[in-house]
Amino acid sequence: MRKLIGILFFLFLFSFYLSVAFAHEAYVLNNEQFTQGLKEFSANPLAPLFDPSKIQISIIITAIVVLVYLVNVLFSTTKNAAFLDKKIKKISVIGPFLIRLAVGASLFIGAQSDALFAPELSISFLPFSETLEIIITITSIMIFLGIFTEVAAIFALCIFTLATFFYGQYMITYANYLGEIIVLILFGSRFLSIDSILFRKKLFISKLERFKHLEVPIVRILYGIALIYAAYSIKFLHQSIPMMVYDEYSLKQVFNASAEYISAGAGLTELTIGLFIFVGFAQRLTVTIMLIFLTLSLIYFKELVWPHLILFGIAISLIINSGDKLTLDYYFIPWIRKRIQILKSIAKK
């Protein structure tokens, strides 16, 4: 019984540990702290993970992750998994719809708060800010309602481009927005939208219909890029920023580990999850894990909800529309299934 309690307690701490990976430091720290952190660079951010005093914990965590993913891969080869996949994909249209609502709501709420895509990106910093705020508000309403969605998305792309000109490569952190904007420009939104009444299912450019299968991959790949870049640029390149979060929220009381170790582990976790989403490996499991710990982070650090709407929207969409033709899962799972069948046939002989 004591061992069981010990294991459960360890898993609880492990879950909380992973939630730190999805704490968005720009929402948790004040602007002065975040700006100061960007000026400080880390020499060897992964070194704490190989500290002899913590190597055992690192090995245990790695073993747990490998085991969970191994079980997931094996389950994915079963008939039950295939049956569940078909059931889930029957509501595939819900995914893009949720993302559209999330983008529209995020842009609208952000505009009312002098924020573009995220709290740290001030609209006031951009030229013609008052006019821009009005344009963003109108664009957000058009996207949310799904009226002339392609046109609204073109405006959104222009706004994203303008922000990139002033905020530079930091905008890669919000490549998830770019992915959805591109998809809306190409394919619009014909589900529960005003456009569906005006144009039915017809696209503005009908020839783009043949590329509709790229809708999910575009969103997924750019979402993965956003996570990978956030992990690298903040938790690795500027490790003092997550360390500030560690100190600010007294996380030492929760973890028996240094701020450097937790920051490095959180960074590696976010990087791995971003990479798995990018290549489409164990997509449903990976996105579900991300969704759970994103929620835990949101609750514990009391972050603003609206910047996370698009993250939740994309996550739910990727869970529903998992295993597209440009994912590793699409090829890897059938290959594993065949290998298992071969082994079973050999065993029978």
Q: For each of these PLM feature ranges, what is it?
A:
Residues 1-24:
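N-terminal secretory/membrane targeting signals
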Residues 6, 21-135, 145-241, 257-268, ...:
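Extended, low-polarity transmembrane helix blocks
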Residues 140-144, 274:
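Short tryptophan-centered beta-strand motifs in secreted/extracellular beta-sheet-rich domains
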Residues 241-248:
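Short Gly/aromatic-enriched secondary-structure transition segments
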Residues 248-256, 260:
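Extracytosolic (periplasmic/ER-lumenal) interhelical loops and adjacent juxtamembrane/interface segments
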